[in-house]
Amino acid sequence: MADKKRYEELINILDQYSYDYYVIDNPTVEDAEYDQKMQELLKIEEAHPEWVTPESPSKRVGGEVLEGFKKVAHDTPMLSLANAFNQEDLADFDRRIRDKVGDDIAYMCELKIDGLAVSLQYENGKYKQGATRGDGTIGEDITANLRTIRSIPMKLQKDYSIEVRGEAFMPKRSFQKLNEIREEEGQMLFANPRNAAAGSLRQLDTKIAASRNLDIFLYAVADFGEMGVETHSAGLDMLETLGLKVNKERRLCNSLEEVYAYIEEWTEKRAGLAYDIDGIVLKLNNLEQQRQMGTTVKSPRWSIAYKFPAEEVPTKLLDIELNVGRTGVITPTAVLEPVRVAGTTVSRASLHNEDLITEKDIRIGDTVLIKKAGDIIPEVIKSITEERSGSEEPFHMPKNCPTCDSELVRLEEEVALRCINPKCPAQIKEGLIHFVSRNAMNIDGLGEKVIIQLFSQHLIKDVADLFFLSKEKLLELERMGEKSVTNLLASIEASKQNSLEKLLFGLGIRHVGAKAAKSLAIHFDTMDNLKVADKETLTSINDIGEKMADSIVTYFANEEVHDLLEELKRAGVNMTYTGPKLEDMSEEELVFAGKTVVLTGKLEKLTRNDAKALIESLGGNVSGSVSKKTDVVVAGSDAGSKLAKAEELAIPIWSEEDLIEYLPDEGGLNE
């Protein structure tokens, strides 16, 4: 019969085996011995369930099925980091540090793990709770799933009560194996290890999380000062003595030159790591100096994340296809041999225009380098000419539209070729897609595939036809059931009440963007007033230049446009501005009256367009860059150089929550 002393001894033995294997990568026993000890432990726990504690190694295998994830408030906010993209950004950061605390500084440089930020709470040395970062103030309780990560100790080497921060991630090998299994089972593949790690930690079945072989690196304590250390580097060393896994590749740098060398080294070596990194984190090493620097609403002023340049990958250019946009612009698109770039498979990429293809001498059949601009949009950088075999074909832009065969023209001062046939089917189709989009009429359920079906089956020929669609016709479309058709018709009906600026933007008048549409709607109040306006009147309005004014006058001079507007009126589409008028609002309501506001970073609750609309409704003008003329910067998470520049210029910083306080009571924008 087992005694409790043996049970506790087994827990300590298995914890040590796990530490040796998962934390310091120095296994001391064979798998068979580990398994034998684990089986002995499980038998004891089966006989004595009253002895089982949350720290038992048996709890790492999962098995618990969760009902959901509770919200967890972080006692100390989990701030995000401002970004640097080049040496100039890093030099600016360094100068701000030196201006504040002097030249006696050092930076701890660490690899920026591409995973999921988490916090671990230990009470008297025992693992108590784990949570996601969330919005930095409130995260989700993922205690059970984090317990399945073998490199997280259930007990520290000392009985500290601390909150530790780190990055949970999926090693490359585990990611590859997971996707191989999912492919065999016909499941959707994960785009990258980061997404796989995040998805694994949000599994309600902890057995699934346990099977994913996640790992972690710890990089901070909520307050290192509580541990009696004076530097960040000493704090990391102490975490290691507690049995926590800290990345070994960190380096203390005493100058920017040493920082640059560290970055260059890991830019070259990153591919050889067993896990993904997407940059380097710099932290002012002295904790007292960190306190002097302080923090902004979203990020510490004493730390910054250098982001690696976009990944560049070679592949074969199979063909060049031409796309016709809603304004008739002909855009060449590269058809590529599929290749993975920055975590996703890319088979098409932008070539922008004919001049760029000629300038870069890009030929069909070339091996080309591609990257994702801003790690989002694939584009062709250049041809690798030394790999040419002689069979490659130079590309020549056709003289006629690939859709309607009309002659293409190049307008004055433009690099793009255009189809100027107003009846071009491709332009009409793209115009319809634009009309229903979120920034325009915002008709839910009318995605690109539905529009293409409606257009190809001749159920719509222009935007007015959308408002006369019948339930019977919609039910004939592929994948359109009773419920989806009912919802779509309700969305179409609701869109009729949109304010005038939404309709104006949706009509796709050349040069008229969402901002100009809003200015026009506010100034003229009705479509009838606008359509008779002359150039002089138009150019007297803010945001309306001569080129745009000419375009507006030309648009409304077209008899077909008059017919279209009459059809829209007949359908009951609103043609009046119904948004707030600045002159009707009090000074207190117009918090941004006459001010220039810049949005930066990722917003958690508002879309960028909603935030922009809210700022404009409060009298502000939204700008894309920070300067001395900027009055306010609204900063979301992961704000980069714009936030840093705003701080340097002492421009007031608002958080997203500050902005949300000014939402209308009805709780929505552009309803």
Curated annotation (Swiss-Prot):
NCBIfam families: dnlj, PRK07956.1. The keyword Zinc applies. Belongs to the NAD-dependent DNA ligase family. LigA subfamily. The keyword Manganese applies. InterPro entries: BRCT_dom (IPR001357), BRCT_dom_sf (IPR036420), DisA/LigA_HHH (IPR041663), DNA_ligase (IPR001679), DNA_ligase_CS (IPR033136), DNAligase_adenylation (IPR013839), DNAligase_N (IPR013840), Hlx-hairpin-Hlx_DNA-bd_motif (IPR003583). It catalyses: NAD(+) + (deoxyribonucleotide)n-3'-hydroxyl + 5'-phospho-(deoxyribonucleotide)m = (deoxyribonucleotide)n+m + AMP + beta-nicotinamide D-nucleotide. It holds the Pfam family HHH_5. The lineage of its organism: Bacteria, Bacillati, Bacillota, Bacilli, Bacillales. This is DNA ligase.
